[in-house]
């Protein structure tokens, strides 16, 4: 039997899932906000990544992205962290051609599915990255360069001992604030009430942010946010859904 060819998509998956070690060979443990799941990368998803990465994919680099060059315009760039399978992200890109969208997802099946849907919808204002979002924010995105951040249904890490793994922490918000332009927004949504309260607390601590909620907590579900599979799951389980929308002063 001939050996299966290792494609670009396979190598990308291997790179993302490789553990990190110090120079003397000891495991370098990092507190991450995501779990590297082992879902199968389908042949279709693999082909979509291999065939369309040049059009949709960006790589981690040690200098800032030139968004005007990448997108061919100076429209606002909206960053979404953890787009899952990418359907809602592609829908937003399709519905808002006056905006550019940049999605980050560490799970290669989701990246492949997102690219496939983007090809189907023929969107031109979307790029995706398969890498740790904290490193992308730090290394690749210039200060005052983002029009907004979207974080929809992040991993809730529901056990108290794992709350430190939740991505929404004061230092994360501080990092995002540096990257946002004035009047840029932070839009979060979750179906875990405890996490919603934490999001509200962390965002409210920043004096540079204004809560757009009339009740100074959560906003009604906005029509412009597409219904995601996580939200549908939450409805089936009887969960509420909480949206937060803050703007940089």
From Swiss-Prot:
Catalytic function, reaction form: guanosine(46) in tRNA + S-adenosyl-L-methionine = N(7)-methylguanosine(46) in tRNA + S-adenosyl-L-homocysteine
Family: Belongs to the class I-like SAM-binding methyltransferase superfamily. TrmB family.
SUPFAM superfamilies: S-adenosyl-L-methionine-dependent methyltransferases (SSF53335)
Entry keyword Secreted: no
The keyword S-adenosyl-L-methionine is assigned to this record: yes
GO terms under cellular component: tRNA methyltransferase complex
UniProt xrefs under Pfam families: Methyltransf_4
Pathway: tRNA modification; N(7)-methylguanine-tRNA biosynthesis
Gene3D superfamilies xrefs: Vaccinia Virus protein VP39 (3.40.50.150)
Record GO terms (molecular function): tRNA (guanine(46)-N7)-methyltransferase activity
Protein name: tRNA (guanine-N(7)-)-methyltransferase
PANTHER family found in the cross-reference section: 3-DEOXY-D-MANNO-OCTULOSONIC-ACID TRANSFERASE/TRNA GUANINE-N 7 - -METHYLTRANSFERASE, PENTACOTRIPEPTIDE-REPEAT REGION OF PRORP DOMAIN-CONTAINING PROTEIN
Broad EC category: transferase
Sorted UniProt keywords: Methyltransferase, S-adenosyl-L-methionine, Transferase, tRNA processing
Phylogenetic lineage: Bacteria, Pseudomonadati, Pseudomonadota, Gammaproteobacteria, Pasteurellales
Recorded name of the encoding gene: trmB
EC number: 2.1.1.33
Disulphide-bonded residues: none
Catalytic residues (positions): 155
Primary role: Catalyzes the formation of N(7)-methylguanine at position 46 (m7G46) in tRNA.
Residues that, per the record, bind S-adenosyl-L-methionine: 80, 105, 132, 155
């Amino acid at each position: 039997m001939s050996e299966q060819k290792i494609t670009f998509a396979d190598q990308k998956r291997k790179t993302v899932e490789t553990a990190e070690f110090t120079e003397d060979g000891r495991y370098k443990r990092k507190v991450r906000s995501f779990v590297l799941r082992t879902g199968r990368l389908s042949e279709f998803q693999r082909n979509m990544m291999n065939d369309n990465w040049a059009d949709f994919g960006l790589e981690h680099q040690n200098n800032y992205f030139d968004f005007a060059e990448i997108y061919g315009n100076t429209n606002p760039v909206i960053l979404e962290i953890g787009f899952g399978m990418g359907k809602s992200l592609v829908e937003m890109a399709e519905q808002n051609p006056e905006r550019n969208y940049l999605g980050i997802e560490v799970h290669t099946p989701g990246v492949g599915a997102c690219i496939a849907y983007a090809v189907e919808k023929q969107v031109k204002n979307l790029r995706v990255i398969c890498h740790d979002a904290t490193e992308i924010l730090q290394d690749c995105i210039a200060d005052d360069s983002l029009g907004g951040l979207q974080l929809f249904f992040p991993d809730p890490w529901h056990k108290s001992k794992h709350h430190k793994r939740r991505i929404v922490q004061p230092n994360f918000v501080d990092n995002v604030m540096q990257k946002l332009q004035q009047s840029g927004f932070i839009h979060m949504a979750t179906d875990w009430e405890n996490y919603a309260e934490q999001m509200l607390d962390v965002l409210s601590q920043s004096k540079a942010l204004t809560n757009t909620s009339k009740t100074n907590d959560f906003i009604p579900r906005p029509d412009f946010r597409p219904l995601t599979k996580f939200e549908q799951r939450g409805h089936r389980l009887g969960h509420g859904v909480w949206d937060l929308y803050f703007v940089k002063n």
